[in-house]
Structures are given as C-alpha cells and as structure tokens.
A protein has these predicted regions:
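SAM/dcSAM-binding transferase cores
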Residues: 41-84
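Conserved Class I SAM-dependent methyltransferase catalytic core
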Residues: 1-34, 39-41, 45-46
Length: 84
C-alpha cells in the first residue's frame, strides 16, 4: 500500500482531510509543529496510506525552538548521525 507524506499550513487542515478521504487516502499519523512552545502551530505533518484502515495516531507536538532561540532536544535528534 502506498504512503503519502504531507507538510501543510494549519488553515488547510480541513481541506487536506477532505481531499485525502475523497481520494482513498486514510490519515495514519498527525503532528502539529510549533516554532516555540507558546506559539500556535505553523505547519502540520500528516502521513496517509492508500486504502488503509481507520485509525489516526496523533503524535505529541514538535516544538522547534527553546525560548532562547536554540533548537530543542527534540529537533537536535534529527541532526544526530543515524549510526554511532
């Protein structure tokens, strides 16, 4: 089964869900991304599966920056080597 990853603005969330279902894509994972913990989400990440079963896993929000402007530990992990 094919998978599709989407990065989109929050104001397009409802439209994205409608189109996914219209074309047989079942949302599987969703994560909201915030620049800082006290700021609203500026994008969302969604993984969909063609013809997949029902069930959406809503992941904890991804916070990009600490209050001092440095990357959060969560984001730093993306830049660590995969093999040590």
């Amino acid at each position: 089964r094919g998978r599709f990853a989407l990065v989109q603005l929050p104001e397009r969330f409802a439209e994205s869900m409608q189109l996914a279902l219209k074309y047989g894509l079942q949302p599987k994972r969703l994560q909201w991304v915030h620049s800082k913990i006290d700021k609203p989400a500026w994008i969302f990440l969604m993984e969909m599966q063609k013809g997949g079963s029902y069930g959406l896993d809503v992941l904890p929000p991804l916070i990009m920056y600490n209050q001092d402007g440095s990357y959060t530990e969560q984001v730093k992990k993306f830049y660590e080597p995969a093999v040590k």
